[in-house]
């Protein structure tokens, strides 16, 4: 791997986004082969230890060659917030820059990018401790479903992105809309555009959906059933994710130390995961398309993306 030519330069963070199965990680790895880099995951599921197959973590052999951060941070029974991600990611970005390395932030979790691209507004937007306490009390009295329905009536776009059991983010979204009278997106539209290098990958819908379907098939071939059912407690935040929550009510047995699900039910679960993944890809595209500072590339134009990023890095470091 070639070292960066000028170690005194502070290399700018590179942001790589896009829908699931679009090849984001592969682009990050290829970029890291050109620059001495640290890859920082912006994926809300890859932070969980042992959840490897359903979260499509990069192969361990690659992670041993190229430093990967914010993967395997907490156990599946632990919760992890956007604020925690932002704090850890900021530290990893600074550590990489102080070591003369290129920080590459890659993933598909929109709120994680939001926290890094708009740190001040994300952290400080209309915090209201009294309102938050009131909302927390409502949560205790009426439950997660009722709070999610409340958000659905006030800010349906944000509600559609959040699972009802993701109560921290539901409460935060309610706090913002009730404090400002504006939806999360309306608040975001008023912010100043960040001066960052960010690319995103996409392709024709049919091609993307086929890639998603093949990825899901591969996950099952690699042992997704065993991974999910070995955790088993679907009350965990980690188990609310696509690829895991679909197993919540399945019937299974244990044979020779392995979890076994009937073929017909397994096919239904697999189809649900594919459908949910395709729907998630639509939501990801909607999220990242609202960033008008993003440069989009087709998934087959990885070289073009790397050339663009390299040019932007040269422009930014030339000003130092």
Regions from the language model: what does each represent?
Residues 2-320:
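Phosphate/pyrophosphate-binding catalytic cores of soluble transferases and nucleic-acid-acting enzymes
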């Amino acid at each position: 791997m070639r070292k960066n030519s000028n170690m005194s330069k502070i290399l700018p963070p590179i942001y790589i986004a896009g829908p699931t199965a679009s090849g984001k990680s592969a682009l990050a790895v290829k970029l890291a082969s050109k620059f001495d880099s640290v890859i920082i995951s912006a994926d809300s599921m890859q932070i969980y230890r042992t959840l490897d197959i359903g979260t499509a973590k990069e192969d361990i052999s690659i992670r041993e060659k190229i430093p990967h951060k914010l993967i395997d941070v907490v156990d599946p029974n632990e919760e992890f917030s956007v604020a925690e991600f932002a704090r850890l990611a900021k530290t990893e970005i600074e550590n990489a820059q102080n070591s003369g390395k290129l920080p590459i932030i890659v993933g598909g979790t929109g709120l994680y990018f939001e926290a890094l691209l708009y740190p001040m507004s994300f952290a400080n937007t209309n915090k209201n401790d009294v309102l938050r306490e009131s909302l927390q009390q409502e949560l205790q009295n009426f439950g997660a479903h009722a709070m999610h329905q409340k958000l659905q009536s006030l800010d349906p776009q944000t509600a559609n992105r959040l699972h009802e059991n993701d109560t921290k983010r539901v409460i935060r979204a309610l706090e913002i809309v009730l404090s400002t009278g504006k939806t999360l997106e309306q608040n975001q539209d008023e912010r100043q555009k960040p001066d960052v290098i960010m690319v995103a990958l996409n392709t024709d819908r049919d091609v993307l959906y086929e890639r998603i379907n093949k990825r899901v098939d591969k996950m099952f071939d690699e042992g997704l059933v065993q991974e999910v059912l070995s955790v088993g407690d679907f009350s965990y935040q980690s188990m609310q994710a696509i690829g895991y929550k679909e197993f919540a009510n399945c019937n299974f047995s244990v044979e020779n130390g392995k979890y076994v699900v009937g073929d017909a039910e397994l096919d239904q679960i697999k189809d649900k995961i594919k459908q949910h993944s395709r729907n998630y890809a639509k939501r990801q595209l909607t999220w990242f398309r609202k960033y008008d500072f993003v440069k989009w590339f087709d998934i087959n134009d990885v070289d073009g993306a790397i050339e663009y990023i390299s040019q932007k890095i040269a422009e930014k470091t030339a000003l130092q």
